[in-house]
Amino acid sequence: MAVFEMRNARKAFGALEVLKGVSLKVEKGEVVSIIGPSGGGKSTMLRCATLLETMDSGTLAYGENVAAREENGKSVYAGKAALAQVRRQFGLVFQQFDLFPHYTVLKNVCDAPISVQKRDRAEVEAEAMVLLDKMGLKGKENAYPYQLSGGQQQRVAIARALAMKPEILFFDEPTSALDPLLTGEVLRVIRSLADEHMTMVIVTHEMPFARAVSDRVVFLDGGVIVEQGSPEQVFENPQQERTKEFLQSYRETSSAQA
């Protein structure tokens, strides 16, 4: 059974239809990168997947837990308790870190497992220290966010998401708010998670990274999935004109910036 499945998701903001029947299934251990131009629907799809936005129509499930079913052409969401269970199954890492500025690094990582999952504090803190070491943040547990670089803050955010022991982790442009010099350290952490077969969906504009780390690449444009396949297929032999145009535009922009 898929860890995550969205079917025929539609979402409009007023007269603007942002998602036009998007379907995505992610299997355990799979790494899926979602690429595409700005305004193509990537972040909206991710927000619907993680219950930050509601779909107008379509279904959404995490394993056996159904978050939204469809009735009479509209999405009908599960009750509060069922959605709380669904939320425990995924983690989300935002562009802007969203750390609590008045909490130490350790408290940022430990707060939700202790307060939401009601887990033992000593156990959670011990696991958090291991996670911070894994993130290259050993010795930073008592620091506050303002004392860290953007790359370090993003790695704290990743550790915080992992502390909840999610079955799948979503990333929304995890390097877009970072100085280019700090991007590599965050991408290395995500790559290490992929090597450990962590199930992940990554919205990214980092094409070389998407190519290197993904099992599958999805090109989303105009609110629809235009093309998807292995990194080799999508990047080396795209079948759709819109995919070819997007990748060519990316290459030209990258060359101009080099």
Features from the language model and the residues they span:
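A short, proline-enriched helix->beta-strand linker immediately N-terminal to the Walker B motif
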Residues: 163-167
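ABC ATPase "signature
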Residues: 228-229
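Short coil-to-helix segment of the ABC ATPase nucleotide-binding domain corresponding to the Q-loop/switch region
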Residues: 103-111
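Catalytic Walker B motif of ABC-type/P-loop ATPase nucleotide-binding domains
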Residues: 169-172
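Conserved ABC ATPase signature
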Residues: 144-148, 152
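Conserved ABC transporter NBD signature motif
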Residues: 58-72
